[in-house]
Amino acid sequence: MGQLRFITGGESHGAALTAIIDGLPAGLQLSRAELDAQLARRQRGYGRGGRMKIETDRVLVLSGLRFGETIGAPLTLQVVNRDFVNWTDRMDPFGAPSGERITAVRPGHADLAGVLKYDRRDARDILERSSARETTMRVAVGAVCRQLLAALGIDIASHVTEIGGVAVDAAAIRADDIGVTNSDDLNCCDAAAGARMRERIDEAKLAGDTLGGIFEIVVRGLPTGLGTYTQWDRRLDGRLAGALMSIQAIKGVEIGAGFACAHLPGSEIHDELYMGADGRPYRKTNRAGGLEGGMTNGEPLIVRAAMKPIPTLMAPLQTIDLATGEAVSASKERSDTCAVPAASVVGEAMTAFVLADAVCSQFSADNMTDLQASLAAYRARLAEVWQNA
């Protein structure tokens, strides 16, 4: 177990969503504007549904912060669901049940397994919590963690590389382009590919269908040696993969060259080392994606995640009605046609949490002054290795 942990609570159409972060060092300065800016990024994206026109997510801090600085206590965050006023009859915590039960479970969703596991008769009891609305609080948590990382010189960015089979021209994308697309409604660095992606999304929306895609996360400024090979559950690659796979609709994660490693010989995969003029080693390639042996190796961290199409279709798939056993069309909920750009923001947030936890665990400190000093001393020791070689 690391130093940081968080839990979230709340339903998609409930009164509010909540998160509690435990283990943050005291003295971390937090910007309310930055917290809200990350939530706004999650709400944007070409292909999002009508819900995003209702909600304007803003973070309320209920504990653990005074005058803009963490105090070492658990940090409690809340986002109010403005749409709750339209759902009070169906989501009342103590009132009598009202509204039609959802029994036509959706293929690809948590509906069927959830009602069986928790012995429910209404799939709304499942879909309200399994909804990706929960990621609002993951982004809020990530917004805190990325401010901690920024104070340590570590930067996180992402971009969408594929939607619905339309892919960017990776060779044409410069490293400096990634992270400057935050205002783009697709978070895409390739304008030509972005135009084709929008066309595919429009086509899918007309057909009542949905689209998935791929996003890439890039992290710069990480020290060499973050993570460890000594135990399976402390390997940084495993922790990152698990965090990203926990995001709703994510079906695959790869680091660096990823699955391409299976098709090529080692001579074409492993990054050769060279000694630079400054007396430090460097690599001409980064197929490892910045991770070797479960540890950072000094190169930028590169992680990609594949998102499946959202399982709520406006042209529903066939399913069964759990109340009657008959073949019916799956139920419909207000949903998105494509949420890959939003998922990239959630991916950044989960990456930020894992890395913030790794840093706080490895350079353990109860306050930011000591944490920054500990990391600075470690970086200085690594620099001396090559100076004295």
Where are these regions (language model features)?
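Generic N-terminal targeting/processing segments that precede catalytic cores or assembly contacts
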Residues: 1-389
